[in-house]
Amino acid sequence: MALHIGTSGWSYPTWKPGFYPDKLPAKRFLEYYSTQLNSVELNLTFRRFANASSQQNWIAATTPGFKFAAKIHQMITHFRRLKDCETPLRNFLQSLDLLREAGKLGPILIQTPPNLKADLALIADFVGLLPTAYQFAFEFRHDSWFTDAVFDVLKKKNAALCWAESEKMEAPHVSTADFLYYRFRQPEYSKAQLKKLTEEFMAQKEVFAFFKHEDTPEGAQNAVTIARAAGIEAKPFEMPAKKGKK
């Protein structure tokens, strides 16, 4: 079982002191994060490509085996709405080459707009463009997509149906790939719910799971609870030395 667990993003000062140490400078957030959790979901790639300098810094800051999932650019999902995407898809994937070459690129999350309804020909054509060397997960935000015909298209490409849940919608738990991709958006999760999720994850071959809470540290804390219960231990981290001390 391979569990890659974390949150959507990490650059949140409001996570102090519940997750980040109070005196930790923001430039070391990712370094500390990677000692507690082993994966993160990049949301910034939805609006802009990750440049080489950023990727080099992320690679250097994270522990061995750490994985970055990346949300695909809005040009593909929201502007072109999955149509005529061969060139922008190729450009997006190439923009992540440094992470991939370092062995730190996780799945690409393809999050469709809420007003994009199911179109079997559209999804079949788009999925046909996806190179098999990558992992892809689809988060559909209109329930018309949740049909066997769509699931079959994903299965043929080993693309995962994202099991996303929020107060507005919950995707059906249908497995379409050899890995699972979860996104948790509920405001609260009880200890019993986290225990159940841990058991569910442990029964799978490979899982990517991300909690979302930008304003408070609960999402990161929930991810840590599951990580520790699943046997993912915290790694050593050295806090910055106080000024005037060596």
Model-derived regions: residue spans:
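Residues lining hydrophobic/aromatic ligand-binding pockets adjacent to catalytic sites
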Residues: M1-K246
